[in-house]
A protein has these predicted regions:
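N-terminal glycine-rich anion-binding loop in soluble enzyme alpha/beta folds
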Residues: 1-26, 30-33
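An interfacial alpha-helical scaffold signature
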Residues: 20-25, 29-30, 175-205
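Short glycine-rich or small-residue beta-strand-to-loop segments that form or flank ligand, phosphate
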Residues: 38-44, 68-70
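Thiamine diphosphate
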Residues: 46-59, 68
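Short acidic, glycine/serine/threonine-rich loops at helix termini
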Residues: 51-54, 79-85, 195-198
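A generic, well-ordered mixed alpha/beta core segment in the N-terminal half of proteins
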Residues: 60-124
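Ligand-binding beta-strand-loop-alpha-helix segment within the catalytic cores
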Residues: 101-192
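Conserved small/polar residues in nucleotide/adenosyl-binding loops
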Residues: 207-216
Length: 217
């Protein structure tokens, strides 16, 4: 594989300790790809809100990622960023926030992830509407899908393409959907959209989702 400027910089400067371990890990990754192996990437925490998609999406398009294991937060927050990026609020001094400051953010429907606030109405509620429609249809038809498959269907349908606020090439989930990569999402229920699903199962108007929920789990 040809070396770009970043690889050249790292090989020139990253010689010892954890820096050297980074080089060794990258070389091992490269060797596995050259040998024809498939690579599963595990995404922890909320890296989608840290805009990991800028680099991750390109890796997926270049066939350097073949499967993904991620948190429910990573799954949904890539789509939140895709449709509501312009409404996000950054808090550089988040360590100095008082309880009053936190309450003010809550009152304005901002959900803080370290130094970045996700807007509830422009991101979460917009995606909720599209997902609920798909969940209800699946329950009515007796269809069973993994969590990521509902997002794949949403992204590939074009239903939200007119609402994109970033370059779609920076969405790793869209890139994964276009490749139909398998995604494992342990603990999906511990996410915003997972809680949306549970709340609609509990709501009287969506009692028919409960049978679908039982089959799903």
């Amino acid at each position: 594989m040809s070396k770009g400027p970043i690889s050249t910089f790292l090989q020139t400067n990253f010689k010892h300790f954890n820096a050297a371990a980074l080089i060794e890990a990258a070389q091992a990754y490269e060797l596995k790809l050259l040998e024809g192996h498939s690579m599963l990437v595990s995404l922890a925490g909320a890296m989608s809100t840290a805009e990991l998609g800028i680099s991750m999406a390109e890796m997926i398009r270049a066939d350097k990622v073949h499967a993904i294991s991620c948190t429910g937060a990573n799954l949904e927050e890539d789509v939140f960023n895709l449709v509501a990026h312009d409404h996000y609020k950054r808090i550089p001094n988040y360590r100095d926030l008082s309880p009053f400051d936190e309450q003010e953010l809550l009152n304005k429907h901002y959900n803080r992830v370290t130094d970045t606030c996700i807007p509830e109405m422009e991101a979460m509620r917009v995606i909720e509407e599209h997902l609920v429609r798909r969940w209800v249809n699946a329950a009515s038809n007796g269809t069973r899908k993994f969590p990521h498959e509902y997002f794949y269907d949403l992204l590939l349908s074009g239903d939200i393409s007119s609402s994109y606020q970033i370059n779609p090439k920076q969405s790793w989930l869209l890139a994964a959907a276009e490749k139909n990569l398998p995604i494992v999402v342990p603990g999906w229920e511990d996410s915003t959209c997972g809680n949306f699903f549970a709340s609609h199962c509990i709501a009287v108007s969506y009692t028919h989702l409960r049978a679908h929920e039982t089959k799903w789990h």
